[in-house]
């Protein structure tokens, strides 16, 4: 979903609020702040990507770095095991985001511009990059 701001910048507030609501049910209380921050940052950066092939990059990197660190801190704190836990969690979050954002995201970025009712909401500069 965080690739949507590439086509629809107005989707950013809805994605951020939706992330916050979902994070209310997270076992990690810090997810309310950091998970939502990762989504906001990913959406804002995705809006600025020059083409659809780079659009999945911000969500993958933001979540990998921010959420990976959050989970590592939650599991082991900032003690000696933090960096090992961070490497593992950043990798696993990154792989999950890569699958979701690249594969499913590209499907969305291909299909949505073809829906006639949605085309008026896509900026012209984006339609040229599809």
Predicted regions and their residues:
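Residue-level recognition of membrane-helix boundary sites in multi-pass small-molecule transporters
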Residues: 10-14, 54
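Membrane-interfacial helix-loop connectors
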Residues: 6-9, 17-27
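Generic transmembrane alpha-helix motif of multi-pass integral membrane proteins
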Residues: 1-11, 42-46
């Amino acid at each position: 979903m965080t690739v949507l701001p590439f086509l629809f910048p107005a989707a950013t507030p809805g994605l951020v609020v939706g992330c916050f609501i979902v994070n209310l049910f997270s076992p990690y209380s810090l997810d309310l702040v950091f998970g939502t921050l990762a989504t906001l940052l990913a959406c804002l950066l995705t809006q600025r990507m020059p083409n659809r092939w780079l659009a999945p990059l911000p969500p993958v990197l933001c979540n990998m770095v921010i959420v990976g660190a959050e989970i590592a801190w939650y599991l082991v704190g900032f003690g000696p095991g933090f960096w090992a836990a961070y490497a593992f969690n950043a990798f696993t979050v990154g792989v999950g985001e890569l699958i979701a954002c690249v594969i499913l995201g590209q499907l969305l970025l291909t299909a949505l511009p073809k829906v006639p009712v949605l085309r008026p909401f896509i900026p012209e500069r984006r339609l040229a990059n599809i």
